[in-house]
Amino acid sequence: MEDASGSYPFGVATADGTPLQIDAENAAVRGINEWSWGSMSPGIPPAAFRPYSLPQFMDRPGPYPYQSSSSSSRELSGSAAKVAIPRTTSASSQSQRRRSARACEPCRQRKIKCDGSKPVCRQCIDHNVSCFFVDVKRVRDQKQLGLLGKKVEQYERLLQELEKEVDENAARRIRKVLRGTDISSPTDDGGDSDSSISSIGSLEALDLVEEDLNRSEKTVATGFFGKNSEVAWMQKLEDEAKSRNRKKEDSTDMEDGVAGGHTMTPPQKQETAMAAMSYYLDDIGIPLMDSVDPYALPPKDLANRFFTAFMDSVHPSFNVVRKTAFVSQYRQFFSQPAQPPQRWLAILNMIFAIGCRYTQATSGRPDSGDYNDLVYLNRARKLTLSENVIFEHADLQQIQVEFLVALYFVSKCQINRAFKFSSMAFRSAVSLGINLRFVDDRTQYPAKEARIRLWWSIFLLEHLLTAITGRVSCVGESLSATPLPIPYEEEAFGRPDVLPLLQDSSLRMTRLKLTLLQSDEESRADVSWLPSCEPSPSLYFHCIVDLATITQAIINKVYSIQGLRERASQVEQRIRRFSFNLDMWLSKVPEAYRFTSGSGDQLDLPSDRNAPWMRERISLAMSYYSSRLTLCRPCLTHTGLAPGDPSPDPAVPPSARQGSRRISSSRMQFNTAMALTCVRSARSLLCCIPETPDITWLTTMTPWWCILHYIMQATTTILLHLSSWPTRLPNDPMHQVSADIEATSRETKKALRWLHHMAYKYPAARRAFRQCNSIVRRITPSLGIDISDIPSGKDLPTEDDAYHLRDIDNTPSSRAGSMEFERHH
């Protein structure tokens, strides 16, 4: 027998075809060569003559391919009578693949071998079974943990959103859960405690009336002005200016104020009467001309001038009449004289009255003769607003008359009267369901669209009056189901790209959804669609309505009694959300109407004041910046404060002031950023008007019926900013909000020059200038601002007292008699 130690005696070939050799020095197989061949049983053939071969693929890979033989040799090591016999394999096993490290789920359930082939293994193919693989437990746990983590983040975001919508007890429980605190624990709410409810600057005393508004005819005519009104802001400025003067007289108190980091502390109680700070003209009576002929008309040329002035300057902002139909009726009326309905004549006379106001401003004609707007008002009054007609039920034309009367009073700065007639138009419209979707198949599409635009015109006017007066509004996004107006003119309703919006209500509700109610995805889709519409008055009307809904929501949610009862953190969350809505609206403004450049909201108007769509750009810009400063006004109180300083507002209790010291750095940064935005928005609004005052330009290029409101809103915001300025600015980065004093004072002087110029023509502007001029001259000396170039106002005409209402004698006896009469009548 040959020596078997030289080569493997079976001649087994490896995978590459070469004979498999065994290293004699390998300790793992050394036992094979050391066997005692002579001691074997004679009946067993020598190993070299075994007609067996090892399989090419083993079931279990190991450090040595002949594991079964080695195992057998170990078993025989204790008994020389046994020889290791390799396992017999069939020819088919030569091509069998080794078992997969991870079986598919069907093979694992049936407990059979799986080759691990993907996407389908061999066993599943043979058994016609759907093959799929499941991750190992460790991977499954990791994925499940990731999914649970994302769900927790979603739930936390949802709870944060719900926190500002629920009542205070539920909000407190939500905050404790988010902080990981036991909700049943009675512990304090930390730095965000209930004491910080009143910490938003201008929202204190929101639910209070600090004077008797029924004490005289003048106070009754003036009415109430709420916290979001610039009249209330002016009242606060007057009280602070008086406080500053008192400190100036008392040097000790003044030094204490400087040492405390503030220039003044507001008085503990309102000192100035509301009627004294209102620059509107509700205390001036409206003459009733009983001698006017309600059926008389101005000369045709003058009538055309008034009619065109209204249609060009006012109708794009208030689509109160269906333009194509009314223009056709107007032409027919003058070409073929007939007796139209009284309410149609009343609408025409109110259009003449408003157009006459526009013509007076642009032509400089005195308000006399056919240029007297009061004549047209009295004609409309006799036709539809007499004692008998007022008790009749209102139809669409009566709603239009009431609306136009309210708008006329706005242009006359008779805000309280406008508020009354606007409420009448609103109630009449709701009584006819104009605030709801109109789906009557018998009514033509243009007529349906006219009702939609009438409703949104009422909404716009009601919103404007709410912004001016600060009173509770009748309108809100939850009241109306009417879709946004279509951004196309009536002449384009038959086009293939426009007609589906009229025919498919679901498409219209999806495409023309309010920005206030849109999700992020819907807003981004709108950004690409709306700018594709061609510029037109209807597109402008669509944009201004969409913006007004956001601003009205700001007034309803922030400047509300509900907002007063909420925590400062909840109010701040609302401000963040509405700020995002305004950003989204700005991103959707079509290119023809854009008034900003880049991604920010910095004003960037064309240098050519006669550029196309310039009036629309300026009107949208003024409305946008007015919305911005209204939103951020509650944070303006913090501009003069260093981090950690207590709030200077008198309504804040000591416990709230202690809580304000615990305000986080992020909240202070938020307040500062919002205050900066408020001041910048006010300055941008004033930048919309040129440096040189021009009444004609102001009337033709701006919303002239409420331009005084915009100018005073921006001016009062800047004056509030200046009044909260410390006399010595600390070197603190948080005070960068007040760093540009030169630009701020420059815009203030510009506003005063405009008010002074307007004061020669408008009594309301005259009152506004005198109020602002008085406050500026009292607060600027301590700030080192030179006001020598501001007109003094001594050259202005005196107040016209011809129609002023007299004040009732405020003695106890007269008041007792007056109140006794009120109780019985």
Swiss-Prot record:
Region (Disordered): 60-102, 239-267, 642-663, 804-825
The UniProt record lists the keyword Chloroplast: no
Gene Ontology BP, a term: DNA-templated transcription
Phenotypic effect of disruption: Leads to increased production of ochratoxin A (OTA) in the presence of OTA-inducing carbon sources such as sucrose, glucose and arabinose. Increases the amount of superoxide anion and H(2)O(2), as well as the sensitivity to H(2)O(2), in the presence of sucrose, glucose or arabinose.
Alphabetized CDD domains for the sequence: fungal_TF_MHR, GAL4
Compositional bias annotation for Basic and acidic residues: 239-251
GO molecular function: DNA binding; DNA-binding transcription factor activity, RNA polymerase II-specific; zinc ion binding
SUPFAM superfamilies xref list: Zn2/Cys6 DNA-binding domain
Cited Gene3D superfamilies: Zn(2)-C6 fungal-type DNA-binding domain
Keyword annotations from UniProtKB, A to Z: DNA-binding, Metal-binding, Nucleus, Transcription, Transcription regulation, Zinc
Name of the molecule in the record: Transcription regulator galc
Organism annotation: Aspergillus niger (strain ATCC MYA-4892 / CBS 513.88 / FGSC A1513)
Taxonomic classification: Eukaryota, Fungi, Dikarya, Ascomycota, Pezizomycotina
